[in-house]
């Protein structure tokens, strides 16, 4: 029994030491000592209630009849004009006109010989023109040759008719 009472006495002493250390810390930090033993939340509630007594009333759904209440009434809030802000936001949201269309050929990966093709393309244009001219000349020559043979065939046919009619 004596061991348990000694253990309890020792625990009480340690508790007292802790309380003294806590008191010293409170004094150091400037907090008030709890004399009442009431919880801190109770003190805060009492302070809030005192503050609420002097708050202005927001009577939205009913008109007070008491003069004291009419004096403490908060004026109705006026809606804020937001038209200008909305216009600015709409203007900012408008996309800027695209000046140049994006060419998909520029975005796609290119073949390794694309630069050679680009350099040769100019020369090929000149050659295409020459080729077209040469083809046109050949066609004209054939037509002239056919006209001559056609004319001789017509002459031969007319000669045969004249011979046959004789």
From Swiss-Prot:
Keyword NADP: no
Lineage: superkingdom: Eukaryota
InterPro entries: mRNA_splic_Cwf18-like
UniProt biased composition (Basic and acidic residues): 10-56
Annotated Gene Ontology cellular component terms: nucleoplasm; post-mRNA release spliceosomal complex; U2-type spliceosomal complex
Disulfide bonds: none
Modified residues (N-acetylmethionine): 1
Location of N6-acetyllysine modifications: 53
Cross-link (Glycyl lysine isopeptide (Lys-Gly) (interchain with G-Cter in SUMO2)): 94
Location of the region described as Disordered in the Swiss-Prot/TrEMBL record: 1-56, 147-166
Keywords associated with the record: Acetylation, Coiled coil, Isopeptide bond, Phosphoprotein, Ubl conjugation
Modified residues (Phosphoserine): 149, 165
Pfam families for the chain: cwf18
Matches recorded under PANTHER family: COILED-COIL DOMAIN-CONTAINING PROTEIN 12, PRE-MRNA-SPLICING FACTOR CWF18
Name of the protein described by the UniProt record: Coiled-coil domain-containing protein 12
Organism: Homo sapiens (Human)
């Amino acid at each position: 029994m004596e061991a348990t009472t000694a253990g309890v006495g020792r625990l009480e002493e340690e508790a007292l030491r802790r309380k003294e250390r806590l008191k010293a810390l409170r004094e150091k930090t400037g907090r008030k000592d709890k004399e009442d033993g009431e919880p801190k939340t109770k003190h805060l509630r009492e302070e809030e209630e005192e503050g609420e007594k002097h708050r202005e009333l927001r009577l939205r759904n009913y008109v007070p009849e008491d003069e004291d209440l009419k004096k403490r009434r908060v004026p109705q809030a006026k809606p804020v004009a937001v038209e200008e802000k909305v216009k600015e936001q709409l203007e900012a949201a408008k996309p800027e006109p695209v000046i140049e269309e994006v060419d998909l050929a520029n975005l796609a990966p290119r073949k390794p010989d694309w630069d050679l093709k680009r350099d040769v393309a100019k020369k090929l244009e000149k050659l295409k023109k020459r080729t077209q001219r040469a083809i046109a000349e050949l066609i004209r020559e054939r037509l002239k040759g056919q006209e001559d043979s056609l004319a001789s065939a017509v002459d031969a046919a007319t000669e045969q008719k004249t011979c046959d009619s004789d």
